[in-house]
From Swiss-Prot:
Homodimer and homohexamer; in equilibrium. Keywords: Glycosyltransferase, RNA-binding, Transcription, Transcription regulation, Transcription termination, Transferase. SUPFAM superfamilies: PRTase-like (SSF53271). It comes from the Bacteria. InterPro entries: PRibTrfase_dom, PRTase-like, PyrR, PyrR_bifunctional. The lineage of its organism: Bacteria, Bacillati, Bacillota, Bacilli, Lactobacillales. It comes from Lactococcus lactis subsp. cremoris (strain SK11). This is Bifunctional protein PyrR.
């Protein structure tokens, strides 16, 4: 299986900054925002967006971690390790994940969000949209669109979890 780096650390940082600016531009009431990262790498991405919002706007945006495993329809249900101590009712929730592929993780995330409260709206921010949707789900904020084949995989590496920042494509041989 061949792996190739397609996005380096600098380009990844720029994509996260661009997502942050787009969030600022499209949300008039930033004080109503709540960032929810989808475990695992979506959590680190959401924290980085939270830090950039703090730097750019001086706001401490509430943050939570969502475990979608209990809500998946294509995998065995597992223990819920969600960590959201925020009332999301009436808030503008931004779900954050590393890669958007079939849409099944996001559908599960929305189920998890609805279980916690009734947000005013839910938006989606992803670092990579690779296509191949099985459900009618579209990201509001996309760092990079990287079309892939079904025999390819996008691997997002984040320093908090993997020791470095990069995006790789892995092809089946």
């Amino acid at each position: 299986m061949a792996r190739k780096e397609i996005i380096d650390e600098i380009t990844m940082k720029r994509a996260i900054t661009r997502i942050t600016y787009e969030i600022i531009e499209r949300n008039k009431e930033l004080d109503k925002l709540v960032l929810i990262g989808i475990k695992t790498r979506g959590v680190y991405l959401a924290k980085r967006i939270q830090e950039r919002l703090q730097q750019l706007e001086g706001l401490e945006i509430p943050f939570g971690e969502l475990d979608t495993r209990p809500f998946r329809d294509d995998k065995q249900a597992q223990e819920d390790t969600t960590e959201i101590d925020i009332d999301i009712t009436g808030k503008d929730v931004i779900l954050v994940d590393d890669v958007l592929y079939t849409g099944r993780t996001i559908r599960a995330a929305i189920d998890g969000i609805v279980k916690l409260g009734r947000p005013a709206r839910v938006q989606l921010a992803v670092l990579v949209d690779r296509g191949h949707r099985e459900l009618p789900i579209r990201a509001d904020y996309v760092g990079k669109n990287i079309p892939t084949g079904h025999d390819e995989e996008i691997i997002v590496q984040m320093s908090e979890h993997d020791g470095n920042d990069s995006i790789l494509i892995k092809r089946e041989d």
